Structure formats: C-alpha cells, structure tokens
Amino acid sequence: MTLRKIIHIDMDAFYASVEMRDDPSLVLKPIAVGGDPDKRGVIATANYLARKFGVRSAMPSWKAKQLCPDLIILFPDFDKYKRESKAIHEIFHLFTDLIEPLSLDEAFLDVTDVDALRGSATWIAQEIRQLIWKERGLTASAGVAPNKFLAKVASDWHKPNGQFVLTPKEVDAFMVHLPVEKIFGIGHVMAKKLHSLGLMNCGDLQTLDITTLQKLFGSRAWNLYELCRGIDHRFVISDRIRKSLSVESTFLEDLNNLELCYQEIPNLIERLMIRYEKISNQYYKKKPFIKIKFADFTTTTVENTFFKAFDLETYQTLIRIGWERKKAPVRLLGLGMSLSLEEEIQLTLF
C-alpha cells in the first residue's frame, strides 16, 4: 500500500490577521473579531497578543473584555474573508486538486502523487506557506503526516507561522507522549474523564485492549483504539458534501431547569451562525434542530420540520419540546441546522 502524504494548512488567527493586514495600526494591539459584548456576542477569533490575556474563540465577548480591557473587537466581514479564502485555495490548486476544505481558514491537501518539488510534501507545504505570505500577506501553519488526523495535530505543533513534519517512522514514538485531549473528538469533559482514569496520554490508552475500551466508552471504543495509535483511514475528499452543521456545549454543572437552558441559547446561536458564515457560499440552511443530553446520559433531538427560522424563538421552542420529554437536569445542549446545496422554495398557504 502506498504511503500517503497529507498536508494540513491552518491559517494563523485568520480573520484577525486579515484585519491587521488591511489596517497596520492594529498590529501591535490586542484585537478580536466577534460580536458586540453588550449583545451577548461571542469571539470568532483573536490575534496572538489578545490570546496572551486568555482571549479565546467561542468565548463570550463580555468575558474577553474583562480579561483584556483594551481589547478591540471588530465586527466580522465574512465577504472579505471568503474572498481571501478563495485566493488561498487558488494557491493550493497550483500543487493539487485533492483539497478538502474544513472551513475558510483550513484545509487538507493530498500530495501523494504530486511530482512538484521532487514529490516532497515537506517542500510543498513550505512553498505553499511562502506563496501565501508573498501573495496575500498572511501567515499559515502546516502539518505534514501520513494521514489526516496526524497532519491536523502536526499543524498545531509549531503555531503560529510554523511547520511540523511527522514521518511514518516517527509516528509510534510520537503517539506515546501525545496528550489524550489532542485526539479528534475529545473535548474538555471527555478529557477530564480520561484523566480521572489515569489516562493522560495516548501511550496510556494503548495499554487498554478493545474489550476494556468498549466497556468504558461504548461505540467510541474502536475509534479511540485506532487514533491513539495514529491510525486514520479517512481519505481527502475534495467533493465532500456536508449534511448538517452544529455546535454544542457540555456543562461542568448540570442545568437544573428550563430557564437555565434558555440562557445558553443566544451564545450557541452566535457560535452556530459564525460557523455557518464560513460555508454560506456553498450551502443553504434547511431545517433547525436541537440536541439535549441529560445528566443520566440519555439523549433526545428535536427537528423543526415546518418552519425554516433559525432565531432565538425557534430554538427556545425546540429546546422546550426536548426538555419536557424528561424534565431532568441537562448535561449538554446542542443547536444545529441541516444543510442543502440547493435553496428550498417555501410555499405559502394562500
């Protein structure tokens, strides 16, 4: 079997970097792109100076201002970011057409069969980053590895404006020391559970056989078994069609009533719409849906099949319907939308 050469390109603080490039007076100031702090907005991204104060993506804007009082919050210009992303993708296409965009600011490239630069994925990634800087005035980080999972992990290793290469021979030794929270799909709550079991890194996970993993993690066991060993069979799919988009929050303390659930909805909607704007040039919104995971880990979902609104009132209604099915403390809330490549025409009743 031919060893694959996968590159993951991740633009550095993309929205903020575009704004600093276009307005150099912002370069030495802490800035973020996001919503109004007075209207329950959230941060889409922050430059690295702001991150030193603890400002992070998906953080409420009011909290970001508390951490960094001098923070300049700019309203996002998604049309500009989409144009910039398109120009960057044109650079990718100079080397390969096997490109899988994940969002406006990151993508996977399969360069396994590319002959340019002597077929070296390392040199190709370096050349792409240099061209992005030369032609667009922006920096990118890159990860080079034998599969998508490892390439994405690698791109974060030397951020910002860095590159990390993981050869097939280095994978086993690298995985032993990789923290479990670096595994795709493991969030804060899952990581906390793993840590409580003494599983701090992938080497610890590798000591568990598949039967033990199944007892602990159910349907996720096989995925964990492979990923903790650096195994990922997924291909780079250039024509991937997305069927839905969602965001969710897992709470360290359960939400004990419906009103507490309602209070979380504006923040989730803001995060969802920021994510949608990144793909709105490709997809139309179809139907809203919600997901609730109760404290006993039972899950319910509700989809709105009649109206195509994606506002606060709609999601409150769906959350209420879902919550009333059990009327119990809530561990996780998720909001989402199904997607379509074609715009649906909604007929009126009269």
UniProtKB/Swiss-Prot annotation:
Active site per UniProt: 106
Domain UmuC: 6-187
HAMAP family: DNApol_IV (MF_01113)
Cofactor(s) listed: Mg(2+)
InterPro entries reported for this sequence: DNA/RNA_pol_sf, DNA_pol_Y-fam_lit_finger_sf, DNA_pol_Y-fam_little_finger, DNA_polymerase-Y, DNApol_IV, IMS_HHH_1, Rev_trsase/Diguanyl_cyclase, UmuC
Residues annotated as site: Substrate discrimination: 15
Transmembrane regions: none
Keyword set, alphabetical order: Cytoplasm, DNA damage, DNA repair, DNA replication, DNA-binding, DNA-directed DNA polymerase, Magnesium, Metal-binding, Mutator protein, Nucleotidyltransferase, Transferase
Higher taxonomy: Bacteria, Pseudomonadati, Chlamydiota, Chlamydiia, Parachlamydiales
A single GO molecular function term of this UniProt record: damaged DNA binding
The keyword Magnesium is annotated on this UniProt entry: yes
Species name: Protochlamydia amoebophila (strain UWE25)
Superkingdom of source: Bacteria
Family the UniProt entry places it in: Belongs to the DNA polymerase type-Y family.
Chain sites annotated for binding Mg(2+): 10, 105
The protein's name in its UniProt record: DNA polymerase IV
Cross-referenced SUPFAM superfamilies: DNA/RNA polymerases, Lesion bypass DNA polymerase (Y-family), little finger domain
SUBUNIT field: Monomer.
